[in-house]
From Swiss-Prot:
<keyword id="KW-0998">Cell outer membrane</keyword>
<protein>
    <recommendedName>
        <fullName>Variable large protein 12</fullName>
    </recommendedName>
</protein>
<keyword id="KW-0472">Membrane</keyword>
<keyword id="KW-0732">Signal</keyword>
<keyword id="KW-0564">Palmitate</keyword>
<dbReference type="Pfam" id="PF00921">
    <property type="entry name" value="Lipoprotein_2"/>
</dbReference>
<feature type="lipid moiety-binding region" description="S-diacylglycerol cysteine">
    <location>
        <position position="19"/>
    </location>
</feature>
<keyword id="KW-0614">Plasmid</keyword>
<dbReference type="InterPro" id="IPR000680">
    <property type="entry name" value="Borrelia_lipo"/>
</dbReference>
<comment type="function">
    <text>The Vlp and Vsp proteins are antigenically distinct proteins, only one vlp or vsp gene is transcriptionally active at any one time. Switching between these genes is a mechanism of host immune response evasion.</text>
</comment>
<keyword id="KW-0449">Lipoprotein</keyword>
<dbReference type="GO" id="GO:0009279">
    <property type="term" value="C:cell outer membrane"/>
</dbReference>
<feature type="lipid moiety-binding region" description="N-palmitoyl cysteine">
    <location>
        <position position="19"/>
    </location>
</feature>
<feature type="signal peptide">
    <location>
        <begin position="1"/>
        <end position="18"/>
    </location>
</feature>
<comment type="similarity">
    <text>Belongs to the variable large protein (Vlp) family. Beta subfamily.</text>
</comment>
Length: 353
């Protein structure tokens, strides 16, 4: 009888011990899941902070109205510096997010870390490019030279740096998945319909500055940025069918020399001459200096505006890739490997590509 009672008591102890162990295991599992989901909340908040910082920074610096007709070229440099600061602040937040992801317990974050590192590399390249552009611009008036009869070529090294910076931004954005529009380049522009106002060796005739302003006003910004990306430079006088870089760096010539290959080339040349070091516009006819200044500011703003659009699209695409990767983070009770079906909740944002 005593043996039977002892067996029963032993069985009860074993059952109670088993129940206790099971309850403890369930408690630990629940705590692990709570810790996992708390980490996801922090990651989600950090992600939203990145969108906010980037949107505010680039939104404040949007370049379609970056310069006015009486501004110095240094204003262009300040714009690029502002964009660069926004990108740097975004990268800092991205690095902080990477730390949050790395520290997340009970989660397989390998893919997320890879995507964040890739996005960080894109930001670094964009920062380098806008820094290069900021250093390439001059510090004289946007429409420098309106009181001097002879136009002057923009510094070739400065123009080359601008071309390189623009090309780098476009290449980075293309690799991120941004569709770069070719735009409508328009047709060739005769010397008398605009080029004469920026390259010839004597004061422009009445109406020349207005014709230049009209050509710039109708230019497609996408086509302008494409022309800058593919531009060449020259050491010599302007010639027929010159591209944007050649017109900007051409030495002054007789009034009938130099035509633009397309409307977009002419407008892009105006932007390059107005941004780069050394470039001077030809003295306009009496009371037409305002038209040259307007053309210069408009051309620069079109280029800056499209560059900002391209940068914004590239960064938004990279952040979108992070968003999708974060949504796929899975819970793991033991090793951090994805062994359970619990996944992160979707992160919402208001950004667009």
């Amino acid at each position: 009888m005593r043996k039977r009672i002892s067996a029963i008591i032993m069985t009860l102890f074993m059952v109670l011990a088993s129940c206790s162990n099971q309850l403890e295991a369930e408690k630990l599992a629940a705590e692990s899941k709570n810790t996992f989901f708390d980490s996801l909340v922090k990651i989600g908040q950090g992600f939203q902070d990145i969108f906010g910082i980037f949107g505010n920074a680039i939104g404040d610096a949007l370049g379609f109205n970056a310069v006015k007709s009486d501004d110095k070229r240094s204003k262009v440099g300040e714009h690029f510096e502002g964009v660069g600061k926004g990108l740097k602040d975004t990268k800092i937040k991205l690095d902080e997010l990477l730390k949050e992801v790395t520290a997340a317990p009970h989660a397989d974050t390998t893919e997320v870390k890879s995507v964040i590192n890739s996005a960080s590399a894109v930001l670094t390249k964009l920062i380098d490019s806008v820094t290069k552009l900021a250093g390439a611009v001059g510090n004289t008036d946007i429409a420098d030279g309106v009181s001097i009869a002879n136009g002057a070529a923009a510094e070739e090294a400065s123009v080359k740096t601008v071309i390189e910076g623009v090309k780098e931004i476009i290449d980075v954005a293309t690799n991120s998945g941004v569709k770069i529009e070719k735009g409508n380049a328009g047709t060739a522009v005769a010397n008398a319909n605009g080029p004469k106002a920026i390259i010839h060796n004597a004061q422009a005739a009445a109406g020349d500055a207005t014709k230049l302003a009209d050509e710039v006003a109708k230019a497609d910004p996408w086509a302008m940025i494409d022309k800058i990306k593919n531009a060449k430079t020259k050491n010599g006088i302007a010639a027929a069918n010159d591209d944007a870089g050649q017109l900007a760096t051409a030495t002054n010539a007789a009034n009938n020399n130099g035509t633009a290959a397309t409307n977009a080339d002419l407008a892009a040349a105006v932007a390059l001459k107005a941004m780069a070091k050394g470039g001077k516009f030809t003295q306009p006819a009496a009371n037409e200096d305002g038209a040259v200044k307007a053309a210069a500011a408009s051309a620069v703003n079109k280029v800056l505006g499209i560059l900002d659009v391209i940068i914004r699209k590239a960064v938004n695409l990279e952040l979108g890739k992070i968003k999708e990767a974060v949504k796929g983070i899975k819970y793991s009770e033991a090793t951090g490997e994805a062994t359970e079906s619990d996944t992160a909740q979707p992160i919402t944002n208001k950004s667009s590509n």
